[in-house]
Amino acid sequence: MTEKHKTMGKFKVIVLAGTAGTGKSTIAGELIHEFKDIYPDLKFIEGDDLHPPANVEKMTRGIPLNDDDRWDWLKKVAVESTKAAASTKEHLSIVACSSLKKKYRDLIRHTCPESEFHFIFLYASKIEVLKRLKTRKGHFMKADMMESQFRDLELPDINDETDCDIVPLDFKTFYQIEKDVIQVVKSKVLNIE
């Protein structure tokens, strides 16, 4: 365990946030690869896998989730990502979770106060997300549900939510996006350069 983790006495959870189609899971895989030498047991939780069947069914039928659909799911995201962090030597995990509204992020924080959550928002324009969703296969979130995600999206005010960062995606290569996210993780979460 690093000295930083010992003194904080908390688990650390990196939350890759943003609308569908922003590459949260793909970036998570890149983070696992990037940090495998210093965090060999780093765990990734796919937040979509934690949705109850009723939520998946609703989204599969093209019906957007409402707040009531999300509360238990968000609590489960907080609990499972904290368990994943607790199971690693360095007490660190990564979770992909849209975390679209401030009240969702607040619920995650308050559900597991023993964890320090850092939300990294992958933000792309509607045009970019639509392009990505149209080429995506095998996922219940379809392009026609994008509007509801953008309607719900409350990008964090990083002066108010100091545990949040926004990484813009438009007009960047995947390599540049990956590099930007890695830099945020190093400087804001792991405190390494």
UniProtKB/Swiss-Prot annotation:
It is found in: Cytoplasm. It holds the Pfam family APS_kinase. Its EC number is 2.7.1.12. GO terms for cellular component: cytoplasm; fungal-type vacuole. Its main location: cytoplasm. GO terms for biological process: D-gluconate metabolic process. This is Probable gluconokinase.
